[in-house]
Amino acid sequence: MLMPKKVKHRKQFKGRMKGVAYRGSDLNFGDYGLKAVECGWLSSRQIESARRAMTRHVKRGGKIWIRIFPDKSLTKKPAETRMGKGKGSPDSWVAVIKPGMMLYEMQGVDKEVACEALRLAAHKLPMKTKIVVREDVANES
């Protein structure tokens, strides 16, 4: 699972999800990408599950980049605990996703294989996504 090695503050506020992503919204590494259409939290388990689905479909070919990292901690209180007595202990890590953020990128496979791999990955994620193709690659085919 993805998680930070060291953090300054173990516990964070929940925060609000508003606005769209201006940074991290373009294809920077690969020719094909999976882009978020709506906001949400992606847990480290979901990120890994989608990555596995992609790598299993492309088998040995291609290169995959994960463009997001779970750097926000979620806390949880033990089961059957009364309210109060402070915030719970850190339980899991999530990545905060804004609309327009590029989640995964892929290169080195043909368009049909890449689109199918990204579609399989999209089914593992709890938000709406779309598949994007680099313009010069789209013009070739």
Curated annotation (Swiss-Prot):
Signal peptide feature range: none
Source species taxonomy: Bacteria, Pseudomonadati, Thermodesulfobacteriota, Desulfuromonadia, Desulfuromonadales
GO CC aspect terms: cytosolic large ribosomal subunit
GO biological process, one term: translation
Protein family: Belongs to the universal ribosomal protein uL16 family.
The UniProt record lists the keyword RNA-binding: yes
The protein, known as: Large ribosomal subunit protein uL16
Any matching Pfam family: Ribosomal_L16
A GO term for molecular function: structural constituent of ribosome
Binding partners and assembly: Part of the 50S ribosomal subunit.
PANTHER family: 50S/60S RIBOSOMAL PROTEIN L16, LARGE RIBOSOMAL SUBUNIT PROTEIN UL16M
Organism: Syntrophotalea carbinolica (strain DSM 2380 / NBRC 103641 / GraBd1)
Protein purpose: Binds 23S rRNA and is also seen to make contacts with the A and possibly P site tRNAs.
The entry's keywords: Ribonucleoprotein, Ribosomal protein, RNA-binding, rRNA-binding, tRNA-binding
